[in-house]
Amino acid sequence: MNKDLLLSSYDYTLANELIANYPANPKEDARLLVFDRKNKEIFHTTFKNLKDFLPDCAIFFNDTKVIKARIYGNKASGGKIELFLHQPFLNSHNPLFLAQIKGRVKKDEILYFKEDLKARVVELLDDGLRKVQFFQNDKTLDTSNLYNLLDKIGHIPLPPYIKREDEKSDLKDYQSIFAKNLGAVAAPTASLHFSETMFENLRKKHKIYHLTLHVGAGTFKGVECENIQEHKMHSEFFNIPQQACEIIDSKQAILGVGTTVTRTIEYYARTKTKSGFCDLFLHPQNPPIRQNHLLTNFHLPKSTLIMLVSAFIGREQCLKLYKLAIKEKYRFYSYGDAMLIL
């Protein structure tokens, strides 16, 4: 079988010390590895110098906002519970939500949280997932009311590879400066590097466009089948404003800031769907057909994200750059350094 289709072909070894537990401070002091595909040139610089490398292009950002999706509570017996909200079921008659619950629960069990918030376990699903309904003062909560309450009592859901509790600084650090549409349970991390000043400077030279893709917990779900074509990609809600669609439909060169932007642009390029659910899986055998350039962080081995990067530059080239980044002590994952692919 073609090595590009084998899960084991996307593996690499990373020392724990290279996993960033906190972002660079200031954020634009993060390092930036630039790879120019045309000339096969590699540059090592800092993120604040990004503008010096950008060609004439429109820049697309994901303006999703991370929910405080992790809450701690108790069962009626007093046993402790941790609930991680994933997403609402949009088509259900009653407001129901998909959640992951740490701790054994039964169908119809009631869980208790701060601010008189209660959750009823409606259904036990596979992979430790649960369908739940939320109440406050015996009134069923819809998405908007629940998100407002989570803003008071919830915690920012840091990724599983950040081995610490969330802190006050994460409220700002794990949210992009242009985040406005509430609904993600993970940040579009390439966006986290941008300060207000840097963003405004970019605006002076480039047309900026926003789209929304609510990053789901599926972004952390590993690929389990050796033949990656058998992987079932998670589905995430997206919305693209008309103005942004017109740019995608044009011949204007596009830089996508982050893998979520890339998947949304490429889904639209294939389907002409402006709003809905994106489950596009990009890899070397299913490469991008529209987006020209990519700004992204360094991703987990064997993840759909490293496969997406490989779709742009080839698997072998991707692994070579990752090997170089490790040698040069770049910081990896959500709070880590960035890579620009031209």
Swiss-Prot record:
Keyword S-adenosyl-L-methionine applies: yes
Query: Which reaction equations make up its catalytic activity?
Result: 7-aminomethyl-7-carbaguanosine(34) in tRNA + S-adenosyl-L-methionine = epoxyqueuosine(34) in tRNA + adenine + L-methionine + 2 H(+)
Q: Does the keyword Transferase apply?
A: yes
Question: InterPro entries, per this entry?
Answer: QueA, QueA_dom1, QueA_dom2, QueA_sf
Compartment list = Cytoplasm
Coiled-coil annotated residue ranges, if any: none
EC number, as in UniProt? 2.4.99.17
| Keywords, in A-Z order | Cytoplasm, Queuosine biosynthesis, S-adenosyl-L-methionine, Transferase
Summary of subunit composition and partner proteins: Monomer.
PANTHER family, per the entry? S-ADENOSYLMETHIONINE:TRNA RIBOSYLTRANSFERASE-ISOMERASE
Q: What does this protein do?
A: Transfers and isomerizes the ribose moiety from AdoMet to the 7-aminomethyl group of 7-deazaguanine (preQ1-tRNA) to give epoxyqueuosine (oQ-tRNA).
Q: Which family does it belong to?
A: Belongs to the QueA family.
Protein name, per record: S-adenosylmethionine:tRNA ribosyltransferase-isomerase
Q: What is the gene name?
A: queA
